[in-house]
Amino acid sequence: MTAIVSIHGRQVVDSRGNPTVEVDVTLEDGSFGRAAVPSGASTGVHEAVELRDGDKTRWGGKGVTKAVHAVNNEIANAIIGLEAEDQELIDQTMIKLDGTPNKGKFGANAILGVSLAVAKAAAEARGLPLYRYVGGTAAHVLPVPMMNIVNGGMHADNPIDFQEFMIAPVGASSINEAVRIGTEVFHTLKKELSAKGMNTNVGDEGGFAPSLDSASSALDFIVDSISKAGYKPGEDVFIALDAASSEFYNKDQNIYDLKGEGRKLTSAQLVDYYVELCGKYPIYSIEDGLAEDDFEGWKILTEKLGDKVQLVGDDLFVTNVKRLSDGIERGIANSLLVKFNQIGSLSETLAAVNMANDASYTAVMSHRSGETEDTTIADLAVATNCGQIKTGSLCRSERIAKYNQLMRIEEELGSVAKYAGRSVLRKAK
């Protein structure tokens, strides 16, 4: 009864006004699944291909009609009739049909849209919410949200070199309370920035994008806002950074060019800068502290901070088991950022999370800067019990949709629900 009878892809628009792929899947029993695919701004060179049309006369070349055509033709012809519950078979059928190592023929945006829509349809056929269908009876951990309240780098038009400054309400007792704490800090920060004559416009992910000249300036504002909101920095609320350092790495010169701060640093010097920041501020997590292929730099960072700070690989691992396996073997980083459009299918995403867990690496479920109202990552965060989620700030409805879904899941789980809280902190903290 879970045989796929129809697949329909279409072009819709994401939160940045760019086209993206949405897919509808219907099963023999009438069950239905719909998924919309996100898109990143700072993308790793090792990510699966996001297929764009390249026709500059339409959508600035960013149309996805080629990917949609693949969904409605080659992919549909191959998987209509297959059982939706056989996720591995469906994903592998699409991957083999594509025939490229990076999903470059159909696009990861086409394959992922179908993959997620199939899972949603199968969940409906079983009469289960998505988190329960994917995660089974063990799914019960609500993630600590890493809330992006100051944007820089590729996510904002300001001098700040680092891309994201996030707050993590680890002292909350529930996801509901964590959202409340985050919202209170967010509104306090807005008042503080406004009082200093700073811009309170928001960036792609809903964080403020003030014209600050350094990471320290942003961190000072955040720590002050946590305190003024009535919480203790380093106890109730910790801070996480996404440096997105591949974006300011000069490969030819092998230096990190922090233009906003007017500094050019070697890998070792940048690591020392992180050590300095972690000594001064309650930072528990740093994402992409070094460039995606700066393995020597990652080794230094892991040796100096790995025992007390979560070191997250985003561009480093791109949710790819081969990249992750290599990183584990090298002993670099200690956490995997999970973005399903980096790899392009649900089964491959879950395989990466399982590999991270087996190596005692943490996993952080993540959105992209170009999002939609689709809330799949909220369900997957609970399904995998990963304990942490990045889904933006406390404004912009495409971000809030995920928080609202997490609160619904928590309510549905009732007494079984467990908020990850302080368990996400490294032991040295």
Swiss-Prot record:
It holds the Pfam family Enolase_C. It catalyses: (2R)-2-phosphoglycerate = phosphoenolpyruvate + H2O. Pathway: Carbohydrate degradation; glycolysis; pyruvate from D-glyceraldehyde 3-phosphate: step 4/5. Binds a second Mg(2+) ion via substrate during catalysis. InterPro entries: Enolase, Enolase-like_C_sf, Enolase-like_N, Enolase_C, Enolase_CS, Enolase_N. Keywords: Cytoplasm, Glycolysis, Lyase, Magnesium, Metal-binding, Secreted. Its cofactor is Mg(2+). One of its GO terms (molecular function) is magnesium ion binding. GO terms for cellular component: cell surface; extracellular region; phosphopyruvate hydratase complex. It is found in: Cytoplasm; Secreted; Cell surface. Mg(2+) binds at D242, E287, D314. The keyword Disulfide bond does not apply. (2R)-2-phosphoglycerate binds at Q163, K339, R368, S369, K390. Its EC number is 4.2.1.11. GO terms for biological process: glycolytic process. It comes from the Bacteria. The active site is at E205, K339. It is an enzyme of class 4 (lyase). Belongs to the enolase family. Catalyzes the reversible conversion of 2-phosphoglycerate (2-PG) into phosphoenolpyruvate (PEP). It is essential for the degradation of carbohydrates via glycolysis. Homooctamer. This is Enolase. The gene is eno.
